[in-house]
Amino acid sequence: MCRLDSERALSLFSYLSGTLAATPFLWCFIFKALYSFTLFTTEITAVFFWSLPVTHLALICMCLCPAAQKQLDRRLEWICASAVFAAVVCAAFSGFTFSRVPFIPGLCVLNCLLLLPYPLATATAVYQAPPIVHRYYELGFCGAFMVYYLLLFKKVFVSGVFWLPFIVFLVGGLLAFRHLEQHVYIRAGMQRRRAIFIMPGKYITYSVFQAWAYCRREVVVFVTLLLATLISTASIGLLTPVLIGLDKYMTLFYVGLLSCVGVSVASRRALFVLLPLAAVLLTLVHILGSGPDMLLVRSCLCCLFLVSMLAAMGVEIQLIRRKLHRALNAPQMVLALCTVGNLCISCLLSVINKVVG
C-alpha cells in the first residue's frame, strides 16, 4: 500500500501535476488540431493557429506578476470547474460550424487564459523537491501530449472521446497537486529556503538583476543555442520539404523547453555530445534524397535534431536551476526563461508553416 507521504506517492503526484501543467497548451493544441487548416484561413481559424505563441506570451507576463499568482492559487478549484464545463460545452458542439455556435472561439480564448495559473503553480511546488521528482513532472507534461498524439494517429478527433483525457488531466492533476503541496519533501524544500532573521522577507528570493549576476554565463550560452536552433530550423523549413504538413505533429516542440529538459544533465560535458550530434543530424536532413521513403527518414532526423538542441539548452537550464536553488522564486524565473525560448521556437515554426504549408 502506497502512503501519501511516501516517495512513490511523491513521484505519482509529480507526474500527474505535469499533466495538469500541460492543460493550457493541450487546450490550444485541441482547437488547432480540430479547426486550424493550412489550405484556408479565416479570422477564427487564425485565432486557433496562433493561440500557442500568445499563450506563451501571457505566461511570461504572469511569471513577472507574483502578486497575481498568489491570488489565483487560491482559486484553482474554481478554475478547474470552469475549464471542465468549457470542455464539456466544446465537446457537445464540436460537430457544429462556428456560424451556429459563435461563442466557441471566445470560449477557447477565455479558457486558455484561465488555465495559465496551472503551469506556474505546479512548477513552483515541484521544483522545491529533489531533482529526481522534476523528471517525473516533465515526463507527465510530455506524456499528456503523447496521449493526444496517439488519439490523432487513431483518428478519433471527431468523437467526444477526444476531450476526455483533457478533463482527466484537469481533475486528476489538481487533486494530485493539492496532495503534492502537503508532501513532506515539498515542505522540507520550503524550509530550506526560509530567510534568516536579518532578511526582510519570510523566504529567500532573488531579483532579476541578482539572478543575472549569478547566471550570466549560462543565460548567454542558452541564448546562443536558441539562436542556433532558430537559424537551423529556418534552414530546414525553407530549403527542404521536411516540415510540410507536419505542423500539428510538431506541437510538442512548441513547448519543448518545458517537456524535454528532463533528458538533460547539469554538466557542460553533455554539450560535447549533443552539439556534434545535432550538427550531424542537421547535415543529413539537408543532403539526403527527396523520395517518399527518404522524406520520412528526414522528418525523423529533423525531430531528433530538435530534441538534441532542446537537450543542449536544457543543460543550461539545469545549471541555472542549480545556481538559483536557494531562492523560492527560482522556479518562476526558470519557467519564464523556458517560455521565452518556447515563444521564439513556436513563432518560427508557425511562420514556416504559413510560408511553406
Curated annotation (Swiss-Prot):
It is a multi-pass membrane protein. The gene is ORF58. Its main location: virion. The chain crosses the membrane at residues 20-40, 44-64, 78-98, 101-121, 132-152, 157-177, 219-239, 242-262, 270-290, 300-320, 333-353. It is found in: Virion membrane; Host cell membrane. Belongs to the herpesviridae BMRF2 family. It holds the Pfam family Herpes_BMRF2. One of its GO terms (cellular component) is virion membrane. Participates in rearrangement of cellular actin to increase intercellular contacts and thereby promotes virus cell-to-cell spreadin$g. The keyword Transmembrane applies. It comes from the Viruses. This is Protein ORF58. Keywords: Host cell membrane, Host membrane, Membrane, Transmembrane, Transmembrane helix, Virion. InterPro entries: Herpes_BMRF2.
